[in-house]
Amino acid sequence: MRLLGDGIQWMLGPEPKNLSPVWTQEVLQLFLRENGEKYSQDSISTLPIPKWGGNLLLLEGTDTTDPNCLKGLLWATPFMNDIVRVAAFSITSEHQSKGYGRAAWNHFVDSAIKGGFSKVQLEVKASNTRGQEFYRKRGLVIMNELQGYYSSGLGYMMRGNLNKY
């Protein structure tokens, strides 16, 4: 994509099924650190995320082959009809509130609209009020409560039109 400053950039990522075990482990650690959720390697490798503008990795440094450079990811997949689903969107806490999330979201929205989609759906933890606010600013609203969706508590399903911010 483009360099965002401080040696950090969003790049198109490989399909999760093509991640090496070391990269998959780094993704699992990112989810555990930032979201408090523990997943298995199989749960990552079976995610149906194609290689497209909704599959982005936030990488820091010059050696983007090093899994330790992973600072965030956005994984989205075509869902149904005109809806695209964000399966995962996570950025390390030290890289939040610096515009990286906005940059990824806007790139994703452009790609999804070009792909014929007009709506987005995702799940977010009820305790993740910052994430909910990020999505509300982009026009998403809570549609349903998701009891038991997250191992660590209540979740919400949010949906809205694809909008940049």
What are the residue ranges of the model-derived segments?
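Positions that flank functional sites
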Residues: 46, 127, 150
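Acyl-donor (CoA/ACP) binding surface of acyl/acetyltransferases
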Residues: 94, 102, 147, 156, ...
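Conserved glycine-rich acetyl-CoA-binding loop
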Residues: 92-106, 125-133, 137-138
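Acetyl-CoA-dependent GNAT
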Residues: 2-94, 105-107, 111, 115, ...
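Conserved catalytic-core motifs of GNAT/GCN5-like acyltransferases
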Residues: 123-124, 136, 141-157
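Short coil/turn segments at alpha/beta junctions that flank glycine-rich nucleotide-binding fingerprints
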Residues: 98, 115-118
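Conserved hydrophobic beta-strand within the GNAT/NAT acetyltransferase core sheet
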Residues: 86, 120-124
